[in-house]
Amino acid sequence: MKSAFLDRIHSPDRPVLVFDGAMGTNLQVQNLTAADFGGAEYEGCNEYLVHTKPEAVATVHRAFYEAGADVVETDTFGGTPLVLAEYDLADQSYYLNKAAAELAKAVAAEFSTPEKPRFVAGSMGPGTKLPTLGHVDYDSLKDAYVVQVRGLYDGGVDLLLVETCQDVLQIKAALNAIEQVFAEKGDRLPLMVSVTMETMGTMLVGTEMAAALAILEPYPIDILGLNCATGPDLMKEHVKYLSEHSPFVVSCIPNAGLPENVGGQAFYRLTPMELQMSLMHFIEDLGVQVIGGCCGTRPDHIKALADIAKDLQPKQRQPHYEPSAASIYSTQTYAQENSFLIIGERLNASGSKKCRDLLNAEDWDSLVSLAKSQVKEGAQILDVNVDYVGRDGVRDMKELASRLVNNVTLPLMLDSTEWQKMEAGLKVAGGKCILNSTNYEDGEERFYKVLEIAKEYGAGIVIGTIDEDGMGRTADKKFEIAKRAYEAAIAFGIPATEIFFDPLALPISTGIEEDRENGKATVDAIRRIRQELPDCHILLGVSNVSFGLNPAARQVLNSIFLHECMQVGMDAAIVSANKILPLAKIDPEQQQVCLDLIYDRREFEGERCTYDPLTKLTTLFEGKTTKRDKSGDANLPVEERLKRHIIDGERLGLEEALNEALKLYAPLDIINIYLLDGMKVVGELFGSGQMQLPFVLQSAQTMKAAVAFLEPHMDKDDSADNAKGTFLIATVKGDVHDIGKNLVDIILSNNGYRVVNLGIKQPVENIIEAYKKHRPDCIAMSGLLVKSTAFMKENLEVFNQEGITVPVILGGAALTPKFVHQDCQNTYKGQVIYGKDAFADLHFMDKLMPAKNSHNWDDFQGFLGEYATENGHNVTTDDGAKTNFGIEEEKLIDASEQSREPEVIDTVRSEAVDPDLERPVPPFWGTKILQSSDISLDEVFPLLDLQALFVGQWQFRKPREQSREEYEQFLAEKVHPILAEWKGKVMAENLLHPTVVYGYFPCQSQGNTLLIYDPELVSQNNGQIPPDATAIAKFEFPRQKSGRRLCIADFFASKESGITDVFPLQAVTVGEIATEYARKLFAGDNYTDYLYFHGMAVQMAEALAEWTHQRIRQELGFGHLDPDNIRDLLQQRYQGSRYSFGYPACPNMQDQYTQLELLQTERIGLYMDESEQVYPEQSTTAIISYHPAAKYFSA
């Protein structure tokens, strides 16, 4: 391959190459019309512009070349037939890609010079379907990419760029499509892959950066980096990892920051200079050699990058890649320090009756559970074998592997004697797998076929020591086969580090003479392979060695044999990890007998055997069974035990420890020194992500119990004056949400503070009265609703009038640091602090009180003296300008830049919404109530959004240092049992009263307005709206100002059409009983149960809404189109959409009064007060459109 691009990037001066900016952003500023796209049906299909308006695309290319870009990308991001099919343009894919490449090359020729050649990258986006989630099969995706690559290649691009990758299986399909076209053409082009890491730190399907590198490392790509989703700040850690570990050139093409919704449009704040400074660091310190811009970047951004690129030298990198397997989530390195790679053996239909029975029953869920159990036992890779006579193994492998990929975090070893089955697994498993296995038993054809698919899918390979004459039984024969296979595999292009030799552990337990040497032969073969082929790995199926023995004897013999093999170089084994014993736990006599058996140390007198270790081993284990080890806890000093009680949230034995401590210390000393020290550790663990919130609350409950036990032993003065400070907290007027406020109460009160908790819906008068009574050191206001933030600001104005100046903490989901530190701080004379979470409040108080006590706090200036200089804790800067508390200031939009022109209301119906579709007939007109007796919770539980419950409500968040595998194991072992327990409790004690009112109202649209008519009127008129009918209600909806120009009214038949359409409405609640029971738990200091139940009630209300919407779809006749899994349901992959007032598509909360009036929700005890708060708290409402084009959007 001759490539001017590679010559340039690998030239001695190691230049930094600059890619262009955002194609979409810079097409939008041209204000293209539907006609420019070739008609309304193609509007939004940027790829079609190379045919309908090529000058628009050429303008973008020229602007970026003029700015100094070295490379522009073709306008083919969505250029596969699969994506173009959404516009009925699938058959144009080859032509559009070729035309786009030729267009970009023509513009490049206008700018290219010998000193600064210009290049064109063929852009290949991710498409709209993720193969790992089953949206599209691997072969279809690969075939679609083949068409695109042919067009780009024939159009003359200089390199191919697979970009914005969200799914590693999608990347493999693209890369293998590219390789197919290269084989057709007899030549290659440079390859670049750019993955997209979302704000949560992984790709969309959950892949970590290390896993992405492990998966892509086997492929012949030239550049690997990141683009899209975030700005450069959130890319830093990923780029750093690539810098240190990737063998490829590193690229970084960020957005201009994170997008924000400003006036209904995506707005990117990062300025050209800010982008320039960030990428300058990446070049000089991390060795990045390819830079550019993604969403929101304009020519001025690219000019800023080009200005620095010509003068900067990338840091010389010395990357070290550790050979690894990977799931779609995380990596597993092959090398294990002082141990071996554990490959779980129980998911094997050839060797496990349990697995075979489950496979025959096609009980896929139980097979997945069997896999998960091996994760708990310590397996690091899962061996997956579905070989069973009479079954369709290709289908079985696809079915099982596709489930394992999304449910188990370990890499897979696909195990079969037939390569077709292994490939079936590779087509659904996007991680880096290992193939088990190939050998020469059927000659070289099958041997090379397995190598071929290993190379194609980037997999490791197990090679058994078997040739055309059968299994190698002697050490010499085993090594001879290994050496032959090694030379062939290396010549084929398989790296030595990806080869696992299996020298075959054959039974030594049969008593057959020719089997006596099997153990020694295997050990000797391992030693020789390790010495002469040192870069390869050596794997064994250990349990074969003990075939036929008593289970207890097998466990010991397997453990001793494993140890012997490790000593001479074995580094991987297929075993049940929980069935291997450490040598220290094996009786010395048993050890010796096993060694004698492995090395065939029988003793003879003449021909008579006087000592047979096999016989001895059988005798030693006669009647014995396997036993599990139970270890006791160490005895700790009472001081340390008290601390551990708090940290572990363990109340068992607490009173005994406290009684012991009372003999040595005063009660206050026990609290202030040892118990609070434990709570301090809890706070540190929570802050570093090592402890989840529910466990923090367990610690708080234990702390509360300890203090309650000690109080009778205290003097009255001690009990009254012990508080570190006083903290006043309230949820503001009109807001019933108290979970966040109560968590602050729990954390502060159990860290030595006196907390005055006023409760929910507190008007400012109550807060002021409480202030005057308790004289708190700090006031905190909480609220979940957007409207609550306005009340907070109003309250601050009243505080000023009342002369209140103490620091005020504001907390709640609707708040942002910018609103607190700009709007609210400018309102209040004292200091305003953004309360990110309960521990942020605690940290502030822990600094405030000693500062006040040492006269280093001023209500107007904030911290003074030494306290004002501690990093992250300043409330004011040195010059007195107000800033935040430990949070980096946000960039603000210059108001003068915003448009001041009067708004013209657009009421023209969107052409993106098809008006000609069959309108359903509802089963009834009007409303219907479903009481608790009509609703089975067993039908609602499966619709729980577990991500929202576990992470959002219960706050079981994955710590950054925890692997995906460890996190999933934690959820399986700790969190799912909690959910199961609460499901049972809710059912047994009738703690939720699910109630629904829903209905169907006749409607028609008129511009941006939806007209609602009397259901009785339509019922009396044969289901039709009379022409002279008067609407009983109207809803006015906003319209998008650009793009598809959607408005909710567009989804319904127009008044002009005369068609009667259907407007479904719903309101659901789990009842006031949920609110009352949550209050009871909190009042009883049952903090953890309070968190669990409150969170579950909130999410059950959401699940009930999903259940009701599902019922409506079924009643309207298209429920059969629903997906068959909860994930797709929650991602709105059904027909139509559900909207709630207050959100961008229908923002007017006043309309909810009308909705509740139509549904007459007071009949189920659901209402909304004057502050627009719905009661009971755990309730939701929604309006529904059944139109296929209806999805969430911002207007």
Swiss-Prot record:
B12-binding N-terminal domain span: 629-722
Ligand binding (Zn(2+)): 228, 294-295
Enzyme Commission number, as recorded: 2.1.1.13
Hcy-binding domain location: 1-309
One MF term in the entry's GO annotations: cobalamin binding
Reported cofactor(s): methylcob(III)alamin; Zn(2+)
GO terms under biological process: homocysteine metabolic process; methionine biosynthetic process; methylation; tetrahydrofolate metabolic process
Keywords: Amino-acid biosynthesis, Cobalamin, Cobalt, Metal-binding, Methionine biosynthesis, Methyltransferase, Repeat, S-adenosyl-L-methionine, Transferase, Zinc
Domain AdoMet activation intervals: 896-1195
PANTHER family: METHIONINE SYNTHASE (PTHR45833:SF1)
Description of its domains: Modular enzyme with four functionally distinct domains. The isolated Hcy-binding domain catalyzes methyl transfer from free methylcobalamin to homocysteine. The Hcy-binding domain in association with the pterin-binding domain catalyzes the methylation of cob(I)alamin by methyltetrahydrofolate and the methylation of homocysteine. The B12-binding domain binds the cofactor. The AdoMet activation domain binds S-adenosyl-L-methionine. Under aerobic conditions cob(I)alamin can be converted to inactive cob(II)alamin.
Family, per entry: Belongs to the vitamin-B12 dependent methionine synthase family.
Role description: Catalyzes the transfer of a methyl group from methyl-cobalamin to homocysteine, yielding enzyme-bound cob(I)alamin and methionine. Subsequently, remethylates the cofactor using methyltetrahydrofolate.
Protein name per Swiss-Prot or TrEMBL: Methionine synthase
